[in-house]
Amino acid sequence: MFGLGKKKKPEDPNSNEALEGESNRSNSVNDAAIQDESSLFARLKNGLSRTRSRLSDGLAEIVLGEKTIDLDLLEEIETQLLSADIGIDATDQIIDNLKKQLRRKQLADPKQFMTALRQELTDILEPVDVPLIIQSEPKPFVILMVGVNGVGKTTSIGKLAKLYQSQGLNVMLAAGDTFRAAAVEQLQEWGARNSVPVVAQATGADSASVIFDAYQSAKAKNVDVLIADTAGRLHTKDNLMNELEKIVRVLKKQDERLPDEVLLVLDATTGQNALNQAESFNKTTTLSGLALTKLDGTAKGGVVFALAKKLSLPIRFIGVGEKIDDLKPFKAKDYVDALFSE
């Protein structure tokens, strides 16, 4: 009787029910994040299956059947690493460090040896595990994409645009590969698919002029990220490499900091030749990062270690499939784990 007409007391935010509800919401978010990470790793693992078959499966065949670890075994390991495109410099470092551990009797059995080997591989990659951070100011953040024909440069631009869009950034593309009409059309197709504006001129136009126009447009429209394509050039052709220098000069006249990133796209299927390309490009223009494509189609994914050891350039992205979201930010530990995952 006396309770009629009284308002119900608001729920105490500190009550057990309120706390339980908040906890459930938090757990749902955490579970979704864990599931997403698990999915990403599964795709990375699947994309690296051919390299894993050559590298880790081959190593396991050599090591796991042995009762003792000795110098003769290390010679077999050295041969296996070289055949997996790890490269001479990286392989020498790995073997030298394993020999030191062997002398200190720290590699008593195959399991310890494989753990030590994985750590050596991770140690080579960790210094180049440097993500590309898009600075919010000044705008636009300019990424200049370079590389030889056929490495997947234009496709990588489309995938990068989608990645940055998913992060809530405004993106514009510059069709700076004016030598091939197909390249301009391909970039415009990527732009249309993702609703990203593309600045382009006629085939044969001056590439530096196209990128200059794109920069001016992006700046006026307050665009967050401008990704500029360039002509696929042979690293042995001086005239094309000189054109790349011109593009950089034109950008620096607008702002000395530009370009913010010079990203070299390399095809993993070329193995050690990718290293030669990177060295040549780095002489012409100062590279700030690498993107390694087509890892899903090759057993030569060991070249990542060769690049890391020889050049010490950040590996920004790796391509592990043909889907639009198969260009992934590079993570050293995940890469090694995927190579040795069963």
Language model region names:
Residues 122-342:
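P-loop/Walker A NTP-binding module and the surrounding RecA-like catalytic core of P-loop NTPases
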